[in-house]
């Protein structure tokens, strides 16, 4: 498993929008990252040995000062080392905005090969299971059709006077994930991007959290 910083870097290299972040290996770097990104920020422990960070207290939202960023960095390091996991650093990331949490996942099926899933995201993704499957390579039009099959699809057009959401950017990200899964040099076995924050038309989407497994 890649750590989250490496996962985000891999996605960004493929043209997939990710939240602005810095990987900090010292308290001083965490303070500098806070000043560079600007508060409030999210602080997350980073370890290739830990996939679900929130369950261990390795995610802190709304950090508002440089002093707090340094303090939380030290706390995250302590938690990771306490659990005997590899300490890869601490991520300082911008507090991304969006109107809907979306999930993009992918895996290698023994029969069909690479499969990409898109659907409603967030912490209840496994409860509501509102997803559609795509077999790469697929086009943006095919991704659009898949999103249109979701139960949440009416929300994309905007309801109760809300503007439409930027589904075009989401389709572009899905297509790029399909291309990534088809690239043997990348060696990606599976990935889970949740949430991908989808904003209003023209404002794009952004990957906030990523878990990627490679060969």
Walk through the language-model features, giving the residues of each:
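ATP-dependent carboxylate/acyl-activation modules
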Residues: 1-215
């Amino acid at each position: 498993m890649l750590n989250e910083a490496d996962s985000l870097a891999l996605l960004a290299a493929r043209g997939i929008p990710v939240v602005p972040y810095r990987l900090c290996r010292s308290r001083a770097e965490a303070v500098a990252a806070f000043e560079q990104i600007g508060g409030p920020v999210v602080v997350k422990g980073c370890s290739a040995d830990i996939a679900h960070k929130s369950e261990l207290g390795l995610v802190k939202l709304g950090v508002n000062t440089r002093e707090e960023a340094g303090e939380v960095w030290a706390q995250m390091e302590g938690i990771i080392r306490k659990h005997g996991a590899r300490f890869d650093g601490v991520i300082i990331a911008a507090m991304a905005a969006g109107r809907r949490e979306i999930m993009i996942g992918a895996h290698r099926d023994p029969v069909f090969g690479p499969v990409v899933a898109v659907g409603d995201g967030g912490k209840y993704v496994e409860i509501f299971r509102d997803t559609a499957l795509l077999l790469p390579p697929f086009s943006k039009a095919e991704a659009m059709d898949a999103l249109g099959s979701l139960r949440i699809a009416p929300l994309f057009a905007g309801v109760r006077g809300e503007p439409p959401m930027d589904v075009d950017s989401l389709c572009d990200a899905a297509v790029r994930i399909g291309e990534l899964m088809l690239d043997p040099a990348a060696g990606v076995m599976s990935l889970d991007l949740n949430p991908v924050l989808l904003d209003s038309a023209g404002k794009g989407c952004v990957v906030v959290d990523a878990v990627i497994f490679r060969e």
